Amino acid sequence: MLTVLAFVFAIAVLIVVHELGHYSVARLCGVKVLRFSVGFGKVLFRRVGRGPDRTEWTLCAIPLGGYVKMLGESARDPERDPPIPPEDLPRTFDHQPVYKRFAIVAAGPVFNFLLAIALYALLAWVGAQEPLPILGAPPPGSIAAQADLRAKDRVVAVGTDEEAPTPVRAWSDVRMRLYEAGIGGRDAIVQVRGADGAERTVRLRELPSAARSPQVDVIEQVGLRLLGGPVTIAEVLPGSAGERAGLRRGDQIVRFAGQPADQASDLIRWIRAMPEQNASIDILRDGLPMTLPVRLGADADSANPGGPKLGKLGAQLSQHVETELIRDEPVHALGHAMREVWRTSMLSLKVLGKMIVGQASLQNLSGPITVADFAGKAASLGWQSFVAFLALISVSLGVLNLLPVPVLDGGHLLYYCVEFLTGKPVPESWQAVLQKIGIACILLLTSLALYNDLSRLFLAHG
C-alpha cells in the first residue's frame, strides 16, 4: 500500500508542477486556457473556474500524465468545433508570436527543474548525517589497491583529466563522482589525505561503467570501502539460512568460512559466491565466542538473469561508520541544488546518448513499475529519501520532455526554432509525418521500459 500511495503522490506532484508551468506562462502571455487536466481517460472530478475564461479543471482515471488545452492550440474541425469569437482570436495559442509559444511549451520542463532545485536546496539546508569518505583497506589486486589507496585515507576531492578535482564532503559525493567518470569512460583523479596528514593524488584507471550494466556497483568493483567497525547482525529473516543456523540480532561476525570478516561488503561477496553450500560462521555473542555451521540458501541474480544463483544468508548486516551532519546555509544550499540538477541532467543525457549508439545497456530504461518500486522504498526510508527521489524523477521528467522528439515538448520547441530561423512554420504535412514517427518512438521506448520492469519483477520473485 505504501508503494502505491508514494507512487501516486509522486506522479501527481510532478504532473501538476509540469502542467502548472504551461498554464502559468500561457496566462502570462494572454492565452486563453480551456482545460487543465491531471491524468487521462475517464473524468473522475470536474470543476469549472469562476474567472472569465471558465477554465475546466479535471482529474482523470489514468494518472500517468496530464495536459493543458489552450484555445487555438490544435487544428479545428469547422463542422464540429464552434467558431472562435473575434474578440478571442488574439488570445489563441496559434496567433501568438513564436517566442511566446516557445516560452509556453518550455515552461513545463523548466518548472520540473525548478521543483528539483527547490527540493535539493531543502535537503541541503536541512542536512543529514552522512558517512565520511574515510577509506578502509582495499582488497588486494583491486583498482584501489593498485592506485595505492590505503586504510584511513580520507578522500578530499575527485575529478578527471577533463574536469579539475572538486571537493567532496560525504561518501555519496565520492560514489557519484566515480559513477560519472565511469559513464564518461575516463580515469578518476582522486586527492586523499593520509592518516599522517599528508595529501597525495592517485589515479583510478579502467573504471567500470554502470551504463553498460545498471546493476554494477562502481564502488565495489573499484575496491573502495568505508572504514568501519565490527560487522554485526541487524536482523534475521524468519525461515532463512541465518535463522536455521542460530544467528541472532546483535551477533558480531568475526570470521566466515575461515576468513576474517572485517568488511560487510567482503562478507556479502563471500556469501553470494557459495549458493547452497555449507560454511562456518565465527561470532561473538555477549562477548562469548561461538562457531555456527550454516547451510546457505540461493537466490536469482538480478544482474544476470538466467545465470548462476547467488548464495543467501537471510540476515541484514550492520557496520558502524563515522558520520557527520552535512548541511549548507540557504544561499549555498541553492547553489548546491543548481549544480546537482545540472550534473544529473548531463548524466542522464550521456547515458541516453550511449544507449542510442549501443555503448550502454537498454536495461537503463525503467518504466512505471520500477519507478513505483523505488517510490515505495524511498518513502519507507523517511521523508528525506522520498524528497530526494522526487527531485531525481523531476529532473528526469524535465530532461525527457526536452528531447527533440515530436509529441514531446522538445519536439515542439524544435519546430519553433526552425520557424524562428526561417520565418515560416514547419508545414503541417511534415508535422503530421514527424508526429507519427515520434509516437512510434515513444511506444517503442515505453514497451522496452515495461519489458525491463516486468523482467525485474519476475526475476525478483523467482
Swiss-Prot record:
Pfam families, alphabetized: PDZ_6, Peptidase_M50
Residue ranges of every copy of the PDZ domain listed in the record: 201-283
Chief localisation class: membrane
Membrane disposition: Multi-pass membrane protein
Entry's localization field: Cell inner membrane
Cellular compartments per GO CC: plasma membrane
Keyword hit for Cell cycle: no
Top EC category: hydrolase
NCBIfam families: RIP metalloprotease RseP
Family to which the UniProt record says this protein belongs: Belongs to the peptidase M50B family.
Stated name of the protein: Putative zinc metalloprotease RSc1411
UniProt organism field: Ralstonia nicotianae (strain ATCC BAA-1114 / GMI1000)
